[in-house]
Amino acid sequence: MIYAKIIQMIIRFWGTRGSVPVCSPSVLKYGGDTTCVELRSKNNDLIVIDAGTGIRDLAVSLKNEKCPESFTMMFTHSHTDHIWGFPFFFPVYRKGQKINISCCNAPCGSGKEIVSGTMRPPIFPVKFENAAADFSFSTIPPEGTEIYGIKVTPVAISHPDGGSGFRFEENGRIFVFLTDNELKYNHKDSIGFEGYAEFCRNADLLVHDAQYNDEEYKMFRTWGHSTYSQVLELAEAAEVRHVCFFHHSPDRTDAEIDTIADSCNALLRTSGKRLSCSAVYKKQEIRL
């Protein structure tokens, strides 16, 4: 598919699952692949966020259109479910392809350390140094930067080993991406619930980790993930327009996710809030 020049920010989701990829008839709607998000600027410039197993299907999509000669990849952190698709991303092996890896200074490592670590024997036969693409590496400063005309502001996530969330602003539209962020426990570098609410303030779209329900969270507190109710609380406090649940538990079926999203929307309707919510599904496209 050839995408015409667009006039708005577009977000496509290629991997929505958390922790580990899953495959069964019960997860076909929301998908079993791990985190990978495609972001397009108003001029159709490409930013890829994370390289979980969903990145392979993004590669297929890029093959079906004219893959940009140059694009940017960003990583939230270096846990395996967010990086292990990188060696299977065809542009890595495309001669003349320009890929900029842009990351924050974080305990999880530099951009080069993250991607090169996925391509080394004995865990993968092709060394990163032998990849055909032309790589460059840049650091996103704490105050943010501009990528393809999009203002990108990072924030430290509350997660074991650290990492970053991002706020993207273009043409007055705001998209905030906070995966693997534990709202009710302060890991090292966490800015706390109120800090995250301010970071998300007035976002048109907030996509946030909601791996657990309240009962599960009692067992997995400190593991670096949030619950549906906590994310709704954050979205209300931040006065966002729409919130999407993300990083679905590998044990969660489509039917269970549907039930959670429906019950959360019913709760919002009775409260009279302008906020709406949904659960992100694989290959979903959102335009801002």
Q: Which residues make up each language-model segment?
A:
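Binuclear metal-dependent hydrolase catalytic cores
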Residues: 1-176, 184-187, 196-197, 254-288
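Residues immediately flanking
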Residues: 51, 181, 210
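Active-site glycine-centered loops adjacent to acidic/histidine catalytic or metal-binding residues
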Residues: 77, 180, 247
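Cap/insert and terminal regions of metallo-dependent hydrolase folds
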Residues: 185-274
